[in-house]
A protein has these predicted regions:
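Intrinsic-disorder/low-complexity, polar/charged segments enriched in Ser/Thr/Lys/Arg/Asp/Glu/Gln
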Residues: 1-7, 15, 50, 63, ...
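Amphipathic alpha-helical segments that line or abut small-molecule/effector binding pockets
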Residues: 15-18, 131, 135
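Hydrophobic/aromatic beta-strand elements that line small-molecule binding cavities or substrate pockets
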Residues: 6-8, 39, 64-70, 81, ...
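Hydrophobic ligand-binding cavity/cleft-lining segments
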Residues: 1-41, 150-151
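Beta-strand/loop substructures that line and gate deep hydrophobic ligand-binding cavities in soluble
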Residues: 80-132, 149
């Protein structure tokens, strides 16, 4: 399993940042590893909504269907994608502050089957992938990365 967690402080109000993050169609705007994202089930974000997210992969792009499995409006949600080869669990939490909010993005990626043997390599690559996504998120939220102890 590979895990990446980041904390981004933003001047945006918490409800605005949450709405932006909860609409998974925005992933392609800030995550350079995502080429397309479309909602396939539900009417807007919320528990049970599903999104097809196309990610860069070798040898060809991979479409992952993310379902929102946990939802606490304006606070936190979890989106899960599962296939025969992997499981991705992304939890986004938004905490308000006087000067905006902190967005915490916690991503876990688990390879399945024979691909699980590549877990050590995945851990190394996932850090670099996460750093690029964090840079895009900082730009999208007009924010800055903050240490884990200061969300």
């Amino acid at each position: 399993m590979a895990r990446y967690t980041t904390h981004v402080r933003s001047p945006r109000p918490a409800d605005e940042a949450f709405a932006y993050m909860a609409d998974l169609t925005n992933f392609a705007e800030w995550d350079p590893g995502v080429t397309d994202a479309r909602q396939t089930e539900g009417d807007g974000p919320g528990e049970g909504a599903a999104f097809d997210v196309t990610v860069k992969a070798v040898p060809r792009p991979l479409v992952l269907t993310y379902r929102i499995t946990a939802w606490e409006p304006d606070r936190t949600f979890t989106a899960v994608a599962e296939s025969s080869t992997l499981r991705s669990v992304d939890t986004i939490t938004v905490a308000p502050h006087d000067d905006g909010c902190t967005v915490t993005y916690d991503a876990e990626l688990t390879l399945r089957g024979v691909l699980a043997l590549a877990d050590p390599v995945l851990r190394l690559a996932f850090g670099r992938i996460g750093d690029r996504a964090t840079a895009g998120l900082v730009e999208a939220l007009d924010g800055a990365v903050v240490p884990a102890e200061a969300p």
